[in-house]
C-alpha cells in the first residue's frame, strides 16, 4: 500500500507561481497542491491550471494579514484541510517585504513553513529557529544596554566624591 500524496498549501500566487509549482512537484512527486490567493490573482491561477477545487480565494483584505485570514472562510478551509506542508512564495530571494504572508502561514502552520524563492529554491523555516534567533537578539540588546549603562554611570558614580 502506497503512502497518500503530500498535501501542500501554497500561499501567495504571483509571477513565479509556475516555478514554485514545479519546485514543489520535483521535491514531492505526486503532491496535491492547494493555492491561497487573493481574487486579483485568479487569472494567474487559471493560467497555471489550478482548478477551483485547489484554490482558496481570500477576499477579506487586499493583502494577507494573520488575524483577518484566520477569521475568514479561506482561513477556516485552510485549517480544516490538515495540510502536510505550508509553503510561501517569495518574490524576493531573502523574503524582504513578505512578513505578513509569513505570519499568516505561521497561523496555519505554527511549527514553520517552507519558503519558495523565484528561482525555485526551497527554504525551510522552523518556528523554534525563529524564536531562538529573536531571543538571542533580545538578550544581546539587554546586554549591550547594561554595558552602556555601566560605561556611562559607573564613572559618574566613581567621580562623585571629587566633585565640588
For the regions a protein language model found, what residue spans apply to each?
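Active-site-proximal region of nucleotide-activated glycan assembly enzymes
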Residues: 116-164
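Active-site and donor-binding regions of nucleotide-sugar-utilizing enzymes
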Residues: 5-32, 36-132
Amino acid at each position: 500500500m502506497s503512502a497518500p500524496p503530500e498535501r501542500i498549501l501554497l500561499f501567495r500566487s504571483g509571477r513565479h507561481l509556475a516555478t514554485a509549482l514545479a519546485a514543489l512537484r520535483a521535491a514531492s512527486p505526486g503532491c496535491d497542491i492547494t493555492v491561497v490567493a487573493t481574487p486579483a490573482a485568479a487569472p494567474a491561477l487559471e493560467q497555471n491550471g489550478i482548478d477551483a477545487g485547489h484554490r482558496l480565494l481570500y477576499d477579506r483584505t487586499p493583502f494577507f494579514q494573520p488575524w483577518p485570514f484566520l477569521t475568514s472562510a479561506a482561513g477556516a478551509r485552510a485549517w480544516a484541510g490538515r495540510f502536510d506542508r505550508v509553503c510561501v512564495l517569495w518574490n524576493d530571494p531573502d523574503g524582504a517585504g513578505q512578513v505578513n504572508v509569513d505570519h499568516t502561514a505561521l497561523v496555519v502552520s505554527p511549527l514553520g513553513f517552507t519558503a519558495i524563492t523565484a528561482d525555485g529554491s526551497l527554504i525551510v523555516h522552523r518556528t523554534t529557529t525563529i524564536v531562538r534567533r529573536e531571543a538571542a537578539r533580545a538578550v544581546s540588546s539587554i546586554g549591550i544596554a547594561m554595558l552602556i549603562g555601566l560605561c556611562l554611570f559607573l564613572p559618574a558614580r566613581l567621580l562623585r566624591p571629587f566633585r565640588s
